[in-house]
């Protein structure tokens, strides 16, 4: 897989930023279709099925179980061509969490996603004062 669409870097960065603000931070699942090409969406998180329907089902299942996934702050959004990486902070199930999300954009829509989530340790256990972000 290669980086393409270098001329669309800023456009793709804005698409992902808007998705984060509208859907992940704003919790507006009704806006999800604005960011995808129908149900076409490749998901690399093994706990979520492919397709926008898989994403919505996973988010809905978490909510039904009383598990919240909150994106409080987007610290940085790095982009090159059709790839956009967002580094965010929030909570998962009430625990402070860092989110690293990588998206591939195709034809102005989010097409593919990889992610890593990590619980942020209590500051009293840190071996330095650099912080997670």
What name fits each language-model region?
Residues 1-133:
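C-terminal and inter-domain tail/linker signature
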């Amino acid at each position: 897989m290669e980086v393409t669409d270098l001329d669309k870097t800023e456009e793709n960065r804005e698409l992902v930023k808007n998705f984060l603000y509208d859907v992940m931070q704003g919790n507006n699942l009704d806006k999800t279709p604005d960011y995808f090409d129908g149900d076409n969406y490749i998901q690399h998180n093994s706990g979520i099925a492919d397709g926008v329907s898989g994403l919505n089902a996973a988010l809905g299942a978490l909510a039904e179980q009383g598990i919240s996934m909150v994106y409080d702050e987007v610290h940085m959004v790095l982009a090159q061509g059709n790839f956009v990486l967002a580094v965010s902070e929030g909570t998962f199930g009430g625990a402070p969490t860092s989110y690293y999300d990588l998206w591939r954009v195709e034809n102005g829509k989010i097409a593919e996603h990889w992610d890593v989530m990590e619980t942020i340790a209590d500051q009293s256990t840190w071996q330095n004062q650099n912080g997670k972000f």
